[in-house]
Amino acid sequence: MARSSAVCFLLLLAFLIGTASAITCGQVDSDLTSCLGYARKGGVIPPGCCAGVRTLNNLAKTTPDRQTACNCLKSLVNPSLGLNAAIVAGIPGKCGVNIPYPIRMQTDCNKVR
């Protein structure tokens, strides 16, 4: 009995670890740090910003990762940060990256696949 309980626990743990998102908001912030000046004032988009956008896009391959990235990106368009929401929303396109959802506060990240 104890052995079967242990096996069930390990299977549950493996399932939970396997479905957990590998991307964190810390990772998103790190990848997009070089975008902050551009997101405040516009101008010329820094090459490092586009490199970070591409890196983040390449990391977000699973549904949980995309949903986490979506929620993290939504936090960037929060008016209290002083970033221009329209500029933030346009960064992926300016970098030639197509993401499957708009970056805006109203986006329902639970629907991102």
From Swiss-Prot:
Gene Ontology biological process terms, A to Z: lipid transport
KW Signal (keyword) present: yes
SUPFAM superfamilies, sorted: Bifunctional inhibitor/lipid-transfer protein/seed storage 2S albumin
Top-level taxonomic group: Eukaryota
Gene3D superfamilies: Plant lipid-transfer and hydrophobic proteins
Pfam name, any one: Tryp_alpha_amyl
Signal sequence residues: 1-22
Cysteines engaged in disulfide bonds, as pairs: C25-C72, C35-C49, C50-C95, C70-C109
Tissue expression from the record: Highly expressed in style and stigma, abundant in young leaves and petals, and low expression in young anthers at pollen mother cell stage with an active tapetum. Not expressed in mature leaves or in pollen grains or tubes. Found in the stylar transmitting tract epidermis and in the stylar extracellular matrix.
Keywords (A to Z) from UniProt: Disulfide bond, Lipid-binding, Signal, Transport
A molecular-function term among this protein's GO annotations: lipid binding
Keyword Signal: yes
InterPro entries, per database record: Bifun_inhib/LTP/seed_sf, Bifunc_inhib/LTP/seed_store, Plant_nsLTP
Family designation: Belongs to the plant LTP family.
Function: Acts as an adhesive agent between the pollen tube wall and the stylar transmitting tract epidermis. Binds a stylar pectin in a pH-dependent manner. Enhances activity of chemocyanin, a diffusible chemotropic factor.
Name of the protein in its database record: Stigma/stylar cysteine-rich adhesin
Natural source organism: Lilium longiflorum (Trumpet lily)
